[in-house]
Amino acid sequence: DELGLLVWQEFIQSSSGVDNIPSELPHFLTLLRQSAVHALKVKRNHTSLVIWSGGNELMDENRKPVTLENKNIAMLADLVRMLDPARMFVPTSPSGPEAHISRTPGRSHDVHGWWQYQGNGRQYSYFGDTDSLLHSEFGCDGMSSMQTVARTLSKCPTKPERMKDNDLWRFHGDWWCTYDREETMFGHAEDIRRYIRLSQWMQAEGLRFILESNQRRKWHNSGSIIWQLSEPWPNLSCTSIVDYYGHEKQAYYWTKDAFAPLHPTLDYRRLDYAAGTAVELPLTVLTDSGIAGDAEVAWSVRGLDGATYAKETRTAHLAAAAVNRVGDVAFVMPQTADGLVLVRLT
């Protein structure tokens, strides 16, 4: 309440892939009613509370988000109307016709997913072309810091490993192995420190693009909620942006930038272009309320050796609380010794 943070409060039900359908057994409903009434009376006086939900990822028999047709959810909706009528209630999250982003227009209401980088190309078309109204859970996995890896394992590793090849690694991050992803994107990494840097860069890239894409649909997309900020277990790799021992990953800083009140963004659909290819990408500046006026917007294309291959600075008038299209980033992809360039926006 004091910090002004909005709270989405779910009743204590979650599928997590097990028992997806909310129970309608009479004894369970009796216990759930008692728990829900207590929760409503305790929490309804908090000004930070904005919405109630029946629970996390609750499904029907067809694996679609549960609706008020379920007796369990209908009972909770009635209790909210009776005890906290000023607040919104949703049956579950995700809610609506689809649980995940749909390619069919108009069906992505409150959606979840995904939690891993979808690959060069698909990551950007999947998240960049959605029409979701609310993206209430998504993530991207990345390795923990070197300090956390060394502290978690009895012997500090010098080389990365696949989770499936090492029981201890698997115990600390089975779902979140990024080994093949990094090998595909960057080639083989022998050194654990380099591997961690690559893994954290990919996590940061994946999350930043999703956040910027959703914000470029301002007034059509109402929010983005990352899974997750921190974690209750010392994983070697996970979707958290702050690891178990409190070390910020690169994604922490890139997501912070993406939420900045004044933020330039580039809209693209892949990370690789052949040398000599003409590249033309939309450039937008995202603004919060209260931020408006003329601003200098600059971009540059540089090599890792510091060479500048293209650049431009322009003055643009920025409207407040808006997606300000300020032109394009247009250049011919240069031939570089290492095949890499950096596009910088300011």
Region annotations inferred by a language model:
Residues 96-126:
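C-terminal cap/loop subdomain of S1 sulfatases and analogous C-terminal strand-loop tails that border
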Residues 285, 295, 307-309, 322-346:
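Terminal connector regions
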Residues 1-100, 224:
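Active-site mouth of glycoside hydrolases
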Residues 52, 81, 90, 118-318:
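Substrate-binding clefts and catalytic carboxylate motifs of secreted carbohydrate-active enzymes
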Residues 38-42, 78-79, 209-216, 332:
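A generic secondary-structure signal
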Residues 63-64, 101, 145, 236:
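Short glycine-/acidic-enriched loop or helix-start segments at secondary-structure transitions
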Residues 76, 247, 345:
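An acidic-aromatic loop/edge-strand motif
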Residues 4, 66-69, 104-108, 149-153, ...:
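Short secondary-structure boundary/capping segments
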